[in-house]
Amino acid sequence: MTTSPVKVLIHGASGRMGKALLRLAAEDDALHVVGAVVGRSPSQRVVDGVPYFAANELGGAPAFDVAIDFSLPQGFAPILALCVQRGKPLVSGTTGLDEAQRAGLLQAAGQIPLVWASNFSLGVAVLTELVERAAGSLPGWDCDIIEAHHVHKQDAPSGTALTLGEAATGSGAQPRFASVRAGDIVGEHSVQFTGLGERVELIHRATNRDIFARGALHAAKRLLGKPPGSYRVRDLVL
């Protein structure tokens, strides 16, 4: 018995992550991209067999099983609303969301399964757990989170740095942040715990953006069939 491919809608398809998602999804027989949503009216309506839609045409997107969103904060509310309206899961890696948008996520989680994360790599999922353990085991130590990304990344600190900070804070640390924007750095995060005469440093370096796209695609598959709720990446990939 063959299983039909999962129908995926990619929102934010013109960005770095969107392009990686399209390329990797095309290599996966278990996935079928039914639509790609971009900010402005596309110059081509169909590219490599994938229909393209402008953001203001989102309501006319074809039927899908799960949506994956890597866009900008101003484009987040419409894709969240569409998933709620159609009762479909959402995987989102859009960073820079404000408090109202985060509240909207929590409200939507009562109706659909969703996962929002600043980083979908397996390594960062493990790093987050290690930060929690280190912060709880090293009370009173200084905690510093240093992140570095390419010059075009707008938000700082990065969403991943903030997520790591939340993990540290939840275990009693008081993290400080520093950001670097330089060249074409894909993503580097260092969490340092410094005490008297010693320092613990936890580091994750991404050398290829594909790790994030693969993680998001894997999370999308795992989210199918889940009851409504807000899931963590580690719940789906570890």
UniProtKB/Swiss-Prot annotation:
Residue positions binding (S)-2,3,4,5-tetrahydrodipicolinate: 150, 159-160
State what protein this is by name.
4-hydroxy-tetrahydrodipicolinate reductase
Show the SUPFAM superfamilies listed in the entry.
Glyceraldehyde-3-phosphate dehydrogenase-like, C-terminal domain, NAD(P)-binding Rossmann-fold domains
Q: Where in the cell is it found?
A: Cytoplasm
Q: Where is the active site?
A: 149 (proton donor/acceptor), 153 (proton donor)
A single MF term (Gene Ontology): 4-hydroxy-tetrahydrodipicolinate reductase
Q: Which NCBIfam families match?
A: dapB
Residues where NADP(+) binds: 40
User: Which is one Gene Ontology cellular component term of this protein?
Assistant: cytosol
Q: Name one GO biological process term.
A: lysine biosynthetic process via diaminopimelate
Q: Which UniProt keywords apply?
A: Amino-acid biosynthesis, Cytoplasm, Diaminopimelate biosynthesis, Lysine biosynthesis, NAD, NADP, Oxidoreductase
* Pathway noted in the entry: Amino-acid biosynthesis; L-lysine biosynthesis via DAP pathway; (S)-tetrahydrodipicolinate from L-aspartate: step 4/4
Residues involved in NAD(+) binding:
12-17, 93-95, 117-120
Which reaction is catalysed here?
Answer: (S)-2,3,4,5-tetrahydrodipicolinate + NAD(+) + H2O = (2S,4S)-4-hydroxy-2,3,4,5-tetrahydrodipicolinate + NADH + H(+); (S)-2,3,4,5-tetrahydrodipicolinate + NADP(+) + H2O = (2S,4S)-4-hydroxy-2,3,4,5-tetrahydrodipicolinate + NADPH + H(+)
Class of enzymatic activity (EC top level): oxidoreductase
Q: Which taxonomic lineage does the organism of this UniProt entry have?
A: Bacteria, Pseudomonadati, Pseudomonadota, Gammaproteobacteria, Lysobacterales
Question: Gene for this protein?
Answer: dapB
Entry-linked Pfam families: DapB_C, DapB_N
- To which protein family does this belong? Belongs to the DapB family.
Q: Does the keyword Thylakoid apply?
A: no
InterPro entries from the entry? Answer: DapB_C (IPR022663), DapB_N (IPR000846), DapB_N_CS (IPR022664), DHDPR_bac (IPR023940), NAD(P)-bd_dom_sf (IPR036291)
